[in-house]
Amino acid sequence: MAVCARLCGVGQSGGCRRRQQRKGAGNGPELEDEEEEDEVRIEAEVIGGQAAEAPRRPRSLLHLPPEILVEIFSSLPGTELPSLAQVCRKFRQILTTDTIWKRRCKQEYGVCENLRKLEVTGVSCRDVYVKRINPRVKSGRFMKILPDYEHMEYRDIYTCLLHQYRHILGLWQPDIGPYGGLLNVVVDGLFIIGWMYLPPHDPHVDEAMRLKPVFRIHLMERNDATVECMYGHKGPHNGQIQIVKKDEFSTKCIQTDYHRMSGGRQEEFRTWLREDLGRTLEDIFHEHMQELILMKFIYICQYDNCLTYRRIYHPPSRPDDLLNPGFFKGTYGSHGLEIVMLSFHGTIAKVTKITGDPNVPAGQQTLEVDLTRPVQLPDVEHLRNFDEMSRLILDVQAQIHREQRQTGNEEDDGRGAGPDKAEHSQQPAPVLRPANEDANKVDGGDGEEQKPPNVQSFVLPTGVMARNEEYPRSCKMCFYGTGLIAGHGFSSPERTPGLFILFDEDRFGFIWLELKSFSLYSRMRDRFQQSEAPSVEAFEEMLQNMQSWTT
C-alpha cells in the first residue's frame, strides 16, 4: 500500500500539497475528480541527474491496462485494499473486480471452491450440503437451505465471513470443567467450521482421531454471516458466536430443543455412550467405571447450550529435540483415552493434558521427563522383574534427592561450592545415547537376532497393568520422569516417579511405578493450520494459564 501511494504521488509529498494549494486559491469541490487523476501521476525517473525521456510509456498508474492493475492489486493483502480504494475513483472501480478477492480468499485462507461452479451444478451443491452441513441427509430438500451463491461474490466471502471471523481460526480448548477438549476452527471451502477432536475408542490408541462438527459459519445471503450450532441429531440450527476478549470466544445455541431426543435423557445417554465412547451399557461391568462415565455425561450436558473456548498453540520445535513435539493420544486406565501435548523446555520434556478427568483435569502437567537422567534397561529376563525395574527408577530418584539436599545445604551455609564440587557441577549433562549392543540381543539360541545399535528389546514387567498388549517390543531410549496423580476432584496431587520410554518418532510410553500401570501414547497425525505460537514466551505463558483454567 505504501509503495502504491508513493507511485501515485499521494501524501504530503505529492497530491495532498497540490490539493491544499488549490483549495487555498479558492478552487471549489467541482474539481475533485480532476485532482484525483492528478494525484496518481508518476514522477519522471531521474537518471544521471537528467530526466529520462519515455514518451510512449504510461506516466501514471491510471494509464496502465486494467488487467495489469488487477494483477497488482491482487498481490496486496486484503486488509490494505479498502485504503487503496480511497485513492481515486478508478481504483475503487477496479477493486470491484471479483478476481482480486478470489485470489485473496485463496492465498490468505485457502479457499479453492468456485462460486460460479456451485451456482450452476446442483451436484456440487448437494456435495457441499452432505459433506459440511448435514451428513445424514437422504431427501432432496437440501436446496432450500443452501446459501444463495448465485448473487454472491468473493468480496462478500472475504469481508463478511473470512475477515470478520479470522480471530477464531486455530486451536482452542473448551471450558468443560476437568474434561477439556481440542477444537480446531478452520476454513473448509466456503464455510468456517469448528471441529471437535475426539480420541479413538479405548484402547485403540493407534487409530485415527474422530472429528465432530460443533458449529459452522457461512453466508446465506450477501453481507450476512450465519452462525449455526451443530449439536444434536436434528441438523444445524441457530447459534451465536461472541468474541469475549483476545484469545477467547464463546458459542451459544439459540434452539436447544434440537439437542433433545424423543426418548429423553436415557436415549441421549445411550447414543452418547455409543458414539463418543464406542460402548453400550452392557459393556460396562465395573461400578466405578459406570460412575465415571455417568458423571462425565451429566457434566457435558450442562454445557451443550453455551461454551467458552480459550486459544492454545502447537508447541514450538527445535532441531535438537528428542522427537518432534506435538499432540498425542494416550491411555489413562479407567478414564479411557485422553489427548496430551508434548513440549520441550531445555533438558526437560513436559506432557500437558488437553483433555482430562476428575482426578487430574485438563491443563495439568501429567508427565515431566528429565532428559539428563537416561536409564539403562537390563536384558529382557531381568526387565520382566518389577523389583528390578523399581530399583532402577528409585536409584535415580535417590540420587536427585541427594543432589537437591547438597545444593540446599550449600545455600543455607552461605558458601559457594568448593573447587571439586564446582568442577562436578559444571560437568555437561549426560549424553543422550541408546542402549549398548549387549542389551540389544533377543534370546533365540543360535539364531539370535541382532537389533540395530540404537534399539533395544522392551517388555513390561510382570504385574504392570496395560490397557492392551499391543505395545512396541523395542525402544530407543529411556529416561527418569515423574507423573502427576491425585484423588477425586484433584485432591492431594503429588508427583510420583516413573520411567519414560521412547519407542519411535510417533510413540512413547510411561510406567507409573506407584500405580503399577503403563500408559501408551501415539501421535496425532492431523495437521493444524494457524496454530503456531507467536513466540516461545507466548507458549510458556499459555502453559501457565492452562493450569489455572481448571483448578
Curated annotation (Swiss-Prot):
Biased composition (Basic and acidic residues): 414-424, 435-451
Listed transmembrane segments: none
Biological or metabolic pathway of the protein: Protein modification; protein ubiquitination
Protein's name in the database: F-box only protein 31
Annotated segments matching region Disordered: 12-38, 402-459
Superkingdom as given in the UniProt entry: Eukaryota
Comment block on domains: Zinc-binding is required for the structure of the protein and facilitate folding.
Keywords carried by this UniProt record: Cell cycle, Cytoplasm, DNA damage, Metal-binding, Ubl conjugation pathway, Zinc
Family membership noted in the UniProt record: Belongs to the FBXO31 family.
An annotated Gene Ontology molecular function: ubiquitin-like ligase-substrate adaptor activity
Function: Substrate-recognition component of the SCF(FBXO31) protein ligase complex, which specifically mediates the ubiquitination of proteins amidated at their C-terminus in response to oxidative stress, leading to their degradation by the proteasome. Fbxo31 specifically recognizes and binds C-terminal peptides bearing an amide: C-terminal amidation in response to oxidative stress takes place following protein fragmentation.
Location in or out of the cell: Cytoplasm
Subunit-structure text: Part of a SCF (SKP1-cullin-F-box) protein ligase complex SCF(FBXO31).
One annotated GO biological process: mitotic G1 DNA damage checkpoint signaling
GO CC annotation terms, alphabetical: cytoplasm; SCF ubiquitin ligase complex
Residue span(s) of domain F-box: 58-104
A Pfam family recorded for this sequence: Cyclin_D1_bind
UniProt: Zn(2+) binding residues: C229, H237, C253, H259
SUPFAM superfamilies membership: F-box domain
